[in-house]
């Protein structure tokens, strides 16, 4: 068979052009018996690692080859060409070429290249030039210029596109080749692996050009021929040009480069003179241990762990990595930025002694092999969280220290999910906006799954309509396709040499940031190390709370500012509060499921919080671990563990591993330990088990470990049924298994945030509000909870408020929470600064403010809408009328003062008072909360007439009782572990109620569940022994119209009819619920 290499294959990383995944192209090319394939996406190398990973499995059994290249498109008229680097040095030059083009482009994601960029590099590549579709007078000269720049390395691409004039077109291209003295090379210029993908490629093309498939015309491919074809078919097509087929082998002959050649070198860290990196790390670790435990009081266990870890770190030469993370964390702390390491790094006593993590190895039994293992060739991965509002300072420090040639953020591939796929396919097929929106709304959240026929019918559409069917089919295929690249949340790659010679780097949309073209899985595949500089809103909240305590209560805690390490521990009041499920706003335990679990688990010590964090996760739930643990914890079920045969090990072998979790494996580390102790896995095999657990839903590889583990346990004397049950529990972890070290790191913040809520509720509420957006709950729920805990909350006021929510002393309360201007939707920080700067004397009237401030009328209107003129003895309606009478913004200052003076002398018009209900709705519309009441209290009379109870009555209701309730939806949840069950949290003037919606009810009332702001529910009370109450829904009604009516009455009084459609109150009556999936 004649060898044929397809050297111009574009994957779907040629965004909105290629219609196949890189893996599909490689797999199909091998199945068709091609000799090899070249992946060449347009101005990017983003998809090559995925192709490489697929090819690695194939090459073991055949001589099939993969070539890493790129299709270059130029902005100066140079024809397109595919280029392939011959060796590692040439590959580095290709990366730098693309990096230069990306930084030159003004728009993120584009790459602007010119011929001059390639000219001095051309001799390092194999180049295939693509002729233009139409005659271009200067193409022959261009081709000759390219050929002269890289003698012997340039070919002219020849295709047979089945467009009716292939013969004549081929003759024209052959003449060009002869004139320039370059050979022809055959290619099918592939856009997809199989002809079935042609319709999807049409959709992608229409989306790229912002048109529809029906209006795209010649922008679309004329047929479905641009797919991978077998060698015999290519030989037939090019029978008149056999030399073009043979040329594919000549083209690839000099190419030796593969991604396996990329060798990572971690940057050298500065160390004190006379020391090695190993000595410097050794000194820092022991100094940290002395600080934590006392110089002569380091426990022997800790000493042994330190020596063990340092020896392994030295053996693997990872010292620079630890020194880098130590330096970043130290810099943050010097700047007063809270930070804490988490994840598998919390298994390391070295990380604890360096101050990177907060998990004390004497509190938690660590498994260092979960973090670093000599047997597996994986770099360590340390995740460090920083305050989310100050994380950027840390990131810029990293850029400054390592330079932008050697440091960049990892990419995130933004892929199509169900909703985005439906929207783009709908637009491309010309569906109306309302039909496309209806289809998209059949999908919950950001689902990556399919689209249910029943949901389509519920949306008022016909699932048997051919156009709807076509749209659904194409959308399902499109799900998972890359849409574009973005930056990772904070993962940095740092290198000793130029990073832009390993992977192209481009500018991020965010100023002063740059990111590489590969995501975290790609860099794992090629062996690049990553430092994660992540953000966590709760750290911001805690730091702001510490600042407020130090500012307003300096006499406490010895006058010292609190830190993450200095907070009082073992506080019974904190655990008593959590046992009641009183955890709104508390880190990691504020969800509905966690609030329900707290009274059942009843935490009494720190390790209970570690379990609390981990147990309400899909892994333990799907592994059927939750109920056995709770039964054993409460003494309802004995905790008995089998033993191996006496000759194989101690009787308490499993007790040592599972004793603290009542015989139930809750953590990945326990699963690894069971494999190592009970089945005698090596550390490397145990890590393979961990990886199989993490990926079995995608890869299905965990079954390969099943026989080995079960047989290993049986051979050591364990009962086979027990071994099988044990493995099934571990398998239930799936991709959701939670590391104990990670849970311990988070439990640290659970305790701290709970302590703040327990002892300083006004401080905690202010810090939470000042750290938004974060967490499960909106400002209205945070303020309601604070008031229930005895906090006095004061409204936004022009004479007292700051940008942030602050604490202020009042005659009858030591500290009250004053709402800040940040709570007013649309009011800017700049306007706040102007308002505060001129507030040495109180503002007396709106006209006085207008005279003194250079705020535009919009700012005054926002303040009036928010009822922020209370200290001026003027309410919302009067303030809005006063603002309307102010001079126009264009009035010159001299005349503005005169006009304001005149206005101030006019008597105020007596206006009818706003109804209390109108005030409440207006509060929600402007500040997202109200201190004057709740919308439901103004609907209560009508609801009571219907027999609708309050949320408080539901909480007090007897088990099994049927009740009706209505409330504003604040949270929607559909956890992946809940098997289709949906949970709602609703709120009225008396509190909250928790609603459970079973899948069969969800099918009937899907639209109401997904879209209602105010919802009416009939159902039956379900009360647990621990007092956790749910209302199990049977019927639901959307009553949102009642809220709109309450808002509309006031809007009609103040706004001309022609403006009604544009008024913000018609956009949102109540804040959106917070939905979690």
Curated annotation (Swiss-Prot):
Q: Which organism is it from?
A: Brucella abortus biovar 1 (strain 9-941)
Q: Which Gene3D superfamilies match?
A: 1.10.150.870, Metal-dependent hydrolases, Nucleic acid-binding proteins
SMART domains from the UniProt entry: POLIIIAc
The record's CDD domains line, in alphabetical order, gives: DnaE_OBF, PHP_PolIIIA_DnaE2
The question of whether Iron-sulfur is a record keyword is answered with no
Q: Which GO terms describe its cellular component?
A: cytoplasm
Q: What family does this belong to?
A: Belongs to the DNA polymerase type-C family. DnaE2 subfamily.
User: What is catalyzed by this enzyme?
Assistant: DNA(n) + a 2'-deoxyribonucleoside 5'-triphosphate = DNA(n+1) + diphosphate
What keywords are assigned to this protein? Cytoplasm, DNA damage, DNA repair, DNA replication, DNA-directed DNA polymerase, Nucleotidyltransferase, Transferase
Annotated EC: 2.7.7.7
Show the GO MF annotations: 3'-5' exonuclease activity; DNA-directed DNA polymerase activity; nucleic acid binding
Tell where it localizes. Answer: Cytoplasm
Q: What is this protein called?
A: Error-prone DNA polymerase
Its main localization is cytoplasm
Task: State whether keyword Cytoplasm applies.
Answer: yes
Q: Which Pfam families match?
A: DNA_pol3_alpha (PF07733), DNA_pol3_finger (PF17657), HHH_6 (PF14579), PHP (PF02811), tRNA_anti-codon (PF01336)
- Name of the top EC class for this enzyme: transferase
What are the GO BP annotations of this UniProt entry?
Answer: DNA repair; DNA replication
Q: What does this protein do?
A: DNA polymerase involved in damage-induced mutagenesis and translesion synthesis (TLS). It is not the major replicative DNA polymerase.
């Amino acid at each position: 068979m004649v060898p044929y290499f397809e050297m111009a294959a574009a994957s779907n990383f040629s965004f909105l052009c290629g219609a196949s995944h890189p893996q599909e192209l490689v797999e199909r090319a091998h199945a068709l018996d091609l000799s090899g394939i070249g992946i060449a996406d347009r101005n990017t190398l983003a998809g090559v690692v995925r192709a490489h990973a697929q090819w690695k499995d194939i090459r073991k059994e055949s001589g099939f080859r993969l070539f890493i290249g790129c299709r270059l498109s130029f902005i100066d008229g140079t024809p397109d060409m595919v280029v392939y680097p011959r060796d590692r040095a040439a590959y580095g030059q290709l990366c730098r070429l693309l990096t230069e083009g990306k930084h030159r482009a003004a728009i993120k994601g584009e790459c602007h290249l010119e011929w001059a960029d390639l000219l001095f590099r051309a001799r390092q590549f194999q180049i295939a030039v693509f002729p233009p579709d139409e005659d271009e007078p200067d193409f022959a000269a261009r081709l000759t210029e390219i050929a002269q720049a890289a003698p012997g390395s340039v070919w002219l691409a020849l295709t047979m596109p089945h467009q009716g004039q292939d013969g004549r077109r081929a003759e024209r291209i052959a003449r060009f080749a002869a004139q320039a003295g370059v050979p022809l090379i055959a290619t099918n210029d592939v856009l997809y692996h199989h002809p079935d993908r042609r319709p999807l490629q049409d959709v992608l093309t229409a989306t790229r050009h912002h048109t529809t498939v029906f209006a795209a015309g010649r922008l679309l491919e004329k047929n479905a021929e641009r797919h991978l074809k077998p060698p015999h078919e290519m030989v037939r097509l090019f029978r008149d040009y056999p030399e073009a087929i043979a040329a594919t082998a000549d083209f690839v002959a000099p190419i030796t480069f593969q991604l396996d050649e990329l060798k990572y070198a971690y940057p050298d860290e500065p160390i004190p003179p006379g020391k090695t990196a190993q000595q410097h790390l050794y000194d820092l670790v022991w100094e940290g241990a002395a600080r934590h435990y006392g110089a002569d009081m380091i426990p022997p266990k800790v000493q042994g762990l330190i020596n063990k870890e340092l020896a392994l770190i030295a053996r693997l030469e990872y010292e620079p990595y630890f020194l880098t993370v130590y330096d970043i964390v130290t810099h943050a702390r010097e700047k007063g930025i809270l930070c804490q390491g988490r994840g598998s790094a919390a298994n390391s006593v070295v990380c604890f002694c360096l101050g990177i993590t907060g998990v004390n190895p004497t509190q938690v039994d660590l498994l260092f092999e979960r973090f670093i293992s000599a047997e597996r060739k994986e770099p360590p991965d340390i995740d460090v969280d920083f305050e989310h509002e100050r994380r950027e300072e840390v990131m810029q420090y990293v850029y400054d220290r390592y330079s932008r040639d050697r440091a960049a953020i990892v990419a995130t591939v933004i892929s199509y999910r169900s909703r985005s796929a439906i929207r783009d396919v709908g637009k491309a097929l010309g569906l109306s906006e309302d039909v496309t929106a209806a289809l998209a709304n059949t999908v919950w959240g950001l689902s990556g799954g399919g689209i249910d026929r029943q949901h389509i019918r519920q949306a008022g559409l016909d699932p048997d309509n051919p156009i709807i069917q076509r749209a659904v089919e194409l959308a399902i295929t499109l799900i998972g396709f890359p849409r574009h690249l973005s930056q990772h949340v904070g993962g940095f790659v740092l290198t000793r040499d130029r990073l832009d010679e390993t992977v192209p780097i481009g500018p991020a949309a965010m100023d002063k940031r740059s990111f590489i073209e590969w995501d975290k899985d790609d860099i794992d595949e090629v062996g690049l190390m990553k430092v994660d500089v992540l953000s966590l809103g709760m750290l911001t909240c805690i730091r702001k709370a510490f600042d407020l305590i130090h500012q307003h209560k300096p006499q406490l805690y010895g006058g010292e500012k609190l830190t993450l390490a200095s907070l009082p521990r073992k506080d019974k009041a904190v655990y008593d509060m959590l046992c009641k499920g009183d955890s709104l706003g508390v880190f990691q335990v504020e969800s509905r499921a966690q609030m329900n679990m707290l009274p059942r688990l009843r935490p009494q010590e720190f390790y209970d919080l570690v379990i609390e964090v981990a147990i309400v996760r899909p892994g333990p739930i799907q592994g059927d671990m939750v109920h056995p643990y709770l039964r054993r914890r409460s003494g309802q079920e004995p905790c008995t563990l089998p033993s191996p045969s006496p000759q194989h090990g101690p009787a308490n072998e499993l007790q040592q591993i599972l004793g603290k979790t009542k015989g139930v494996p809750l953590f990945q580390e326990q699963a690894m330990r069971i494999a190592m102790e009970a089945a005698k896995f090596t550390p490397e095999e145990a890590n393979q088990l961990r990886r199989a657990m993490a990926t079995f839903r995608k890869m299905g590889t965990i079954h390969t470990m099943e026989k080995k583990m079960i047989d290993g346990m049986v051979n050591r004397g364990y009962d086979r049924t027990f071994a099988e049950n044990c493995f099934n529990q571990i398998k239930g972890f799936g991709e959701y298994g939670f590391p104990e070290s990670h849970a311990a790191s988070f439990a640290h913040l659970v305790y701290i945030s709970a302590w703040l809520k327990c002892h300083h509720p006004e401080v905690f509420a202010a810090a939470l509000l000042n750290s938004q957006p974060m967490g499960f709950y909106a400002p209205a729920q945070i303020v309601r909870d604070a008031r229930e805990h005895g906090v006095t909350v004061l409204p936004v006021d022009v004479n007292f408020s700051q940008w942030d929510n602050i604490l202020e002393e009042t005659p009858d309360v030591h500290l009250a929470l004053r709402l800040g201007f940040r709570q007013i939707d649309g009011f800017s920080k700049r306007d706040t600064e102007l308002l505060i700067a001129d507030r040495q004397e109180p503002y007396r009237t709106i006209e006085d403010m207008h005279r003194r401030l250079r705020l535009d009328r919009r700012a005054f209107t926002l303040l009036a809408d928010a009822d922020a003129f209370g200290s001026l003895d003027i309410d919302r309606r009067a303030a809005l009328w006063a603002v309307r009478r102010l001079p126009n913004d264009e009035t010159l200052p001299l005349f503005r003062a005169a006009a304001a003076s005149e206005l101030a002398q006019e008597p105020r018009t007596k206006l009818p008072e706003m109804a209390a209900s109108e005030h409440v709705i207006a509060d929600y519309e402007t500040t997202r909360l109200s201190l004057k009441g709740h919308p439901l209290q103004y609907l209560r009379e009508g609801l009571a007439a219907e027999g609708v109870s309050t949320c408080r009555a539901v909480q007090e209701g007897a088990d099994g009782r049927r009740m009706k309730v209505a409330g504003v939806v604040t949270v929607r949840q559909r956890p992946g572990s809940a098997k289709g069950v949906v949970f709602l949290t609703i709120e009225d003037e008396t509190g909250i109620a928790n609603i459970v919606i079973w899948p069969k009810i969800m099918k009937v009332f899907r639209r109401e569940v997904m879209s209602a702001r105010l919802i009416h529910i009939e159902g039956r009370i379900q009360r647990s022994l621990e007092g956790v109450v749910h209302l199990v829904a049977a019927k639901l009604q959307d009553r949102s119209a009642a809220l709109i009516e309450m808002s509309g009455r006031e809007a009609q009084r103040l706004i001309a009819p022609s403006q009604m459609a544009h008024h913000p109150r018609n956009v949102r009556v109540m804040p959106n619920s917070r939905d979690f999936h």
